[in-house]
Amino acid sequence: MNYTCTRDNSISISASKAILAGISPDGGLFLPEEFPKVSLNDISKMRSMTYPERAAYIIGLFLTDFTNDELKAYTAAAYSKSRFGEIPAPVIDIGGESILELFHGPTSAFKDFALQLLPYLLTASAKKQGINDKIAILVATSGDTGKAALEGFADVDGTGICVFYPYGGTSEIQRLQMTTQQGKNVLVTAVKGNFDDAQSGVKAIFTDKAYTDELKEMGIRLSSANSINWGRLVPQVAYYFSAYCDMANAGTVKFGDEINIAVPTGNFGNILAAYIAKLCGLPVKRFICASNKNNVLTDFIQSGTYDKNRPFYLTTSPSMDILISSNLERLLYLLSGRNDAEVRGYMAALAKDGKYTVSPGLHRAIAAEFACGFADDTGAAETIRRTFEERRYLADPHTAVAIAVYEEYKRSTGDLTPAVIASTASPFKFSRSVLKALGKDTSGSEFDLIDRLADISGLTIPSRLAGLRDMAERFTGCIEPADMKSFISKGLIK
């Protein structure tokens, strides 16, 4: 299976080349030239598999230059009991909906599913391509990706990683997870501005041919651990198939019937992975795209106009504080009939004017698949309180946004299709916001709050989060977006 580019259909490269490159030189994103087909019979066979086996099966359909034995070894290591516990992606029935818990990995966020596996895929891809260069991983993060990438790549031979996060734009726990990171090949810095400034800076570096050529002469090759990299996205497709198997095994859905999938959405990667699962054969009726107050995606799905020229809000769900949703480009490409010229036009307009309007046909195609809505901080807090009091389920603010939007979707449409809601982070990463939502005391240090939330909820604090209280911060700097390239050159290139 080869991969093409959202902005240039003439490109055709292998999976390992796409993973190594991360992004096309023209700024476009890689997608399979065609999607593998997964029959109900194939899904039925997955029902008795372990999670690592399910993941290896689905990922192997996309990464055809990797052997089945290779992928089984990688997923067994990445999703081991020591990293993810007994059940990496459990589905919890909370009465009315199912919750797909994606926060049981080393950094307590859904990004672990991709970023525990990506180092294996990336280093193996380099070997397959006969490349001995050092691979420098660049990451822009709104909170969770940074720590998950650092955890995945720390001290991996032949790699270095540099993470940029928006100053003041993450939770305190998210920030500490990054600034205390151990490893001889890691760099972290805050960037003045918001996530979009950091992400735009990383994209500009990738498409700066003079700079990337200079690095290649030094034996250094850039790659990405953001969801613009196909190697980040494909592991996420697997957990939607796994969730369906678990729902069928539990009797929550009759095997073969459709489900709805609701996802808290910022950069559009997680919900796009769900849509790709449907393209492959997963029985899905509707996708519910849930935004916070930065509701650029809600407005786009409703109107057909994407406009980032709007106020930027810092919310209690910081991983969704995004106005440029990079993975939306992949959806535009797929639903436009793989029209690369049309996508180039939209992306040029976004770069020039900060907005674009899709064709009526493309807008209809998007609206046919995706429902949408948003919940502000007040709505998310009310959902946290109500869900805990009525269902004894403790949700983090991102998950609460998805629950709130899904409940409103169900009320307004009467759609009673069995639903799964992606829970993307542990509530302990956002203890202050969760305690405030529950009407509890929020005084004291971040670790006082974690302890208090554990007492109130009866839940166990994830060990890696508990361990942060004894770790010293290593990375305390803050730079301007214009200085990102020099920061990389000074720090990562040794």
PLM features: residue spans?
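PLP-dependent amino-acid enzyme catalytic core
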Residues: 1-494
